[in-house]
Structures are given as structure tokens and as C-alpha cells.
Amino acid sequence: MKLHKFENIARFPLFFQLIHRIGGGIFVGSETPRLPCRFRLEKLGKQVYSTSVLFANDKEWGSYPEMIAASDISMRFGQQTLFENVSVKFNTGCRYGLIGANGSGKSTFMKILSGQQVPTTGSISIDKDCRLGYLKQNHFDYEDVPILDVVYMGNEELWKIHQEREYLYSKVDLTEQEEERANDIESLFADAGGYTMEADAAKLLIGLGIPEEKHLQPLSALTGGFKLRVLLAQALFYNPDILLLDEPTNHLDMNSIDWLCNVLKNHRGTVVVISHNRYFLNEVCTHIADLDYQEIRLFTGNYDDFMTANAIALENIRRENQKKESRIAELKEFINRFGANASKARQATSRQKELDKIELQEIKPSSRVSPYIRFNPRNRLGEKVFEANGVSKRYDHTLFENFSAVIGSNEKVAIIGTNGVGKTTMLKLLLKLLEPCDGTVNHGETVELSYFPQDAGEILNLEDHAIDWLARFAPEEGLSEQELRSFMGKMLFSGDEVHKPVQVLSGGEKARLIIAKMMLEAGNVLALDEPTNHLDLESIEALNYALTLFPNTVLFVSHDREFIRSLATRIIEIDDGKVTDYPGTLAEYEDFKRRRARGR
């Protein structure tokens, strides 16, 4: 029997279609398997073959052992327990999405894995000689450091060699001892990949949207979001065996997310990633590590696979419990009816024994809670909503010019493009929150806007308490405190949380408070600028569903491909000063761009 091993299976989709046809249904449809795999093909006779596939999570996959393991990990902060006695293994060749509700302890667990935090109990073991890298958040430590050097620092060994090499070569005269050391350093520099370090670092930075002309500038020359991209390049530059990434897609545009997906899918080691981007989790992950019930459970497959499997498992438990409850009722009725009957005593005793053995399977309360979001417009919306005529906007350079468009009712319009091209500016121009340099913007007479800004500070008063700030947007007749509490409860503010000062709210809480404001306003046109940035997966899905149900116009900026794909009926893309207005979904628009690139 001959064993064929494919390191990059994504290159062989047609091959796997063929194997599906001759292999008796190994795969669903013609889908390329997501896991690293080995394919066995055995010839049994003339034109007769036996096929089988080993995936990286199969027991027979002997050469892909665990790389990092957590044993009996518990984490407590005072009376709060985040997780208890967690034991989990992360294997080579697998990419794990660590998911869970906000506050469940995902980032804490990632810090424990990386050695940045000590657990209350338990230990972390890493295979000998494995290199571990993680995404740092300390960009303030590198403000005056050239961007390329920040990336180089991801490989500590190479960085030290590089520094010593630079020092020796900067000296005019070298002693004999220094010359010998310089020769040794040159050899070490070559072995560590020093001759390609600049090209390797530049490739990472360009892939993350940082142009070459910026690479020698200090990190302080970049805005906050781009600084975090440099730290992501730093983690990737090390090319570690184990890569731990906490929210790597934050501040990335769609092109950079696609680039990162490809990098991680080609990573041969172990990846553990936290993300609230469903597209990213579906594209990258071979497994989901679900942090819930103060424990971590592993599922094979991506995020959608996990959601399906989890829903089926819960439904199966409910159905099984219903059957058991029905049987319990039957047994109790018989026992109560015939328990005192001498002729039925043996049967009653038998049924009592059966009853004693029946146990209902516990359905634990999940830490995941979804907010209830619904946007119900108070007044009717006319056909005309937005009209832009010859709109241009310039700062130190031209963002776009001579843009004209008419946006009608019932349209859901996504404004997309790479970071810095002017998406937020375009949105604010259409909302009349900014004045154009040229041209005009008009609103329909019936338009009543409700707005979610990218920067919560634009509308939140940090001195207010949450409930007091929200009360300002109540209908004219007002709402009682109890009614406001009930309303905020739908957005997951409970008890004394409604009186939290706005300034201490988390990013997710601020986002939910602004969404609550939009619900109270009952506007007939909704505008949202990066609404998913600070929301957890459950809140994103709840918002996504509510906007899908909304009967009127939605205008939004987003980098979340799944959010755009499921919602947008029209795409406005800004690319290097050019605006494309496409009347269709994201999938249709991307197909249009591919055909246009091929000249069709």
C-alpha cells in the first residue's frame, strides 16, 4: 500500500473531487477537507482501488503529536471562577478557534498558554524545542523604534545576532578577537536567516497593508490600528511552532484578513486564535475550542460546523429528556395506581426499580447570552432616502471626487475598502455629518436617521450613568426607570449594571448601549460604522439578524465579510480615490471583479 502525503491540500480541489467519486463518499460534495490529511490509495485489482484518508486529529496520525497541553488549569479572581480543572491538548497541524462569551476568560486562558499569566492551579507543558510566539499588545514600548526593527524583535535570537553584527561592523578598527567574533557572528547570522530578514519582514508588513515607504519610520508614525498590525507581523516573523493570536483581525480590512487567512492556513505548526470574525474562524480553523460552563470542549471543524453540531447535540439531549420524562410519568402513574395492589406488587416494584435508574441529562446554563435586538421604525419612509451629486472630499490628498448616487428605501448598502481610503468619511458625508469639498448631499423629507459611530465617544457622555444617558433618547412621553431597566435587560444590562458610569463600560457594553439607543429612537434609516468591532459572536449574530429583518434602508461600514455577505444588497467600494457603486451582493460584486480582471 502506498501512502501519499499532501502538505498543502488546498491546491488539489479537482483531485479530491475525483477521490470523492471513486472513494465511496469520503467527503461532502466536492469539498476540499479542512484538516491536514494523508491520503491512502490501494490497488485491489484491475481498475479497483481502496481509498482512505487520515486527518490530523485521527489516532493513527502518529507523526503529528500534541505541541502544547494544559493540565488541570483553574483560574479564579476572588470569588469569580473563570474556568475549573481544564485539561486540553493542542496538536500539530491543527488550527484552533478559542471562542466563548465576553468575560468567559478567553484572553486569560491565552495568557496562561503563553506564560504571561500564572493560573490558580494546573500547569502548561510544551514539547521540547518547540518555539512559541504570541501577539503582543504593548505597542507603546516601541514608539521610537523603526518599524522594521519592531518586526525583527519577534525573533529574539536573530535580533541579538543582528545587533551585535551591526555593532562590530560599525567599528573602524577591529581587534583580532573581534575579527574572530565577527566571523562567528556572520555564520550565526546566515544560519538564523539574517540575509533574508529584511525581505521577510517587508513581505509581512506589505501583506498587512503597511507600504514599503513606511518601513524605516518609527512606529509612532502609524495610527493605533496599524501599530497593532506591526505587532502581528512581529509574531508571524518568528515563524513559531506554536502561534497564539488574541483578536488578530481587529483593525484589519478585508484584504488583510484574507492575506492572514492564507498565512495561517499554510502554517505547519499549531495555531490557537481568538476572534469574533465568523468568516475568519470558518476559513482558518480546523477545530473549535469552546470555553463555556467553566470548561473547554474541543470540536472538529470550523465555526459553522461547531454551531451546527452544538445545536444538534442540545436538541438530541432535549428529545432524549422528553422521552425519559414521558416514561417517568407512565411509571409513576402505574406505581401510584397499583402500588398498594397485592396482585400488582411485583410489577410495581419492577417499575420502581426502572424509575430509580432513569436519569435526566443535565443541560447546563450557558455563559453565552444573546441580546434581543429589533429595530422598529416609528414612521413611514418614502422612496427617496439619500442623493449625492458630484461629491468630492479632500484633506492633504483626495479621498474621492465627483461621486454621485441615489439610495432608495429598502436598500442595505455596505461601504467597503482598505483602511484609510475614506469609508467613514463617505458615510458621514451621506449622513450630512461632514461637508463635502464639492457637490451636494440631500435627504428625503421622511428620513429619520439613527446612527452608530465607530468611535463611541462621539455620542456617549462619559460622565453619565448608562441608564441616565439612555433615558435621553426615550419617546416624548418618557419611560419609567422600571421600563428602562427592562429595555436594558434585553441588551444584557442587569441589576446594578444599568447604573454603571459610561466611562467604565467595556467596548462591548458601550456598543450594546448605543444599539439600545438606536432601538429607542425608532428611526426609519439606520447608519452604522464598524458596529461589530467590540461585540462578541452572539451579539454580532443578533445584530445581523435584526438588520436583516429591518424593512428600510441600512447604510453601513464593515470589514466583517460574513456580516456584509449576509446583509448587503448594494456595495460601494472606495479604492485609491475611485468609487465603484455596484447594485448587488458581496458575492456578486466579487464575481464581477474577477470577471473584469480577466477581461470578460
Protein language model features and the residues they cover:
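Acidic, Ala/Val/Gly-enriched low-complexity intrinsically disordered segments
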Residues: 7-10, 28-31, 42, 48, ...
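ABC ATP-binding cassette signature C-motif
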Residues: 49-321, 375-600
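Generic short N-terminal amphipathic or hydrophobic helices
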Residues: 8, 18-21, 25
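Short, flexible cytosolic linker that couples an ABC transmembrane/permease module to its adjacent nucleotide-binding
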Residues: 362-380
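ABC ATPase nucleotide-binding domains
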Residues: 317-331, 335-337, 344-353, 369, ...
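Proline-centered turn/helix-capping motifs that create local helix->coil transitions or kinks
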Residues: 196, 343-347, 357-367, 442, ...
